[in-house]
Amino acid sequence: MPHSFGLRARTRYLFSRGFRNHGLLQTTTFLRTFRLGDYVDIKATGNVHKGMPHKFYHGRTGRVWNVTPRAVGVIINKRVGPRIIAKKIHVRTEHVKPSNSMAAHLKRIQENKKAVVEAKKAGKWVDVRRNPAAPKDGFFVNPRNTEFVEVKPVKYELLL
């Protein structure tokens, strides 16, 4: 049991770089543009020590509330006891990447807009709400065309 409680205690594997991912970072890491309201995933990059988030925030998703030349301000919900607190932290862009959590939602919004525009042109109304899957339709099994399989338990044999 470890007895040190430092800022990066127990992060030997958490902050380590992946297999064949060591060395210099790709230039896209620095050239990304973050805008206010973007959803981002915080993933600490071990070989950049500046602006590294606390280990609690590693793997969390938050929303950008501030953009500075080298860092991004992110709001993250943190559970403290029975309540959830919105924490504001600044993280360097090396430790942040755009999140795909909203991709399906944004795709659905675009499809809905397209469907509504086409329906208006045709003079119709289209329902864009999501509905749960309906039960499957019933059908009759024809015994003449069906091959039956008899299922039996395997006979137990004592092997010594």
Swiss-Prot record:
**Record's protein name:** Large ribosomal subunit protein eL21
Does the record's keyword annotation contain Signal? Answer: no
Q: Has the keyword Signal been applied to this entry?
A: no
Q: Which family does it belong to?
A: Belongs to the eukaryotic ribosomal protein eL21 family.
An example of a GO molecular function for this protein is: structural constituent of ribosome
> What are the annotated disulfide bridges?
none
Could you give one GO CC term from the UniProt record?
cytosolic large ribosomal subunit
Which PANTHER family does the record match to this protein? 60S RIBOSOMAL PROTEIN L21
Extract the SUPFAM superfamilies matched here.
Translation proteins SH3-like domain (SSF50104)
Q: Which InterPro entries match?
A: Ribosomal_eL21, Ribosomal_eL21_CS, Ribosomal_eL21_sf, Translation_prot_SH3-like_sf
Organism the protein comes from? Dictyostelium discoideum (Social amoeba)
Q: Which PROSITE patterns match?
A: RIBOSOMAL_L21E
Q: Which keywords does UniProt give here?
A: Ribonucleoprotein, Ribosomal protein
A Gene Ontology annotation in the biological process aspect, one of them, is: translation
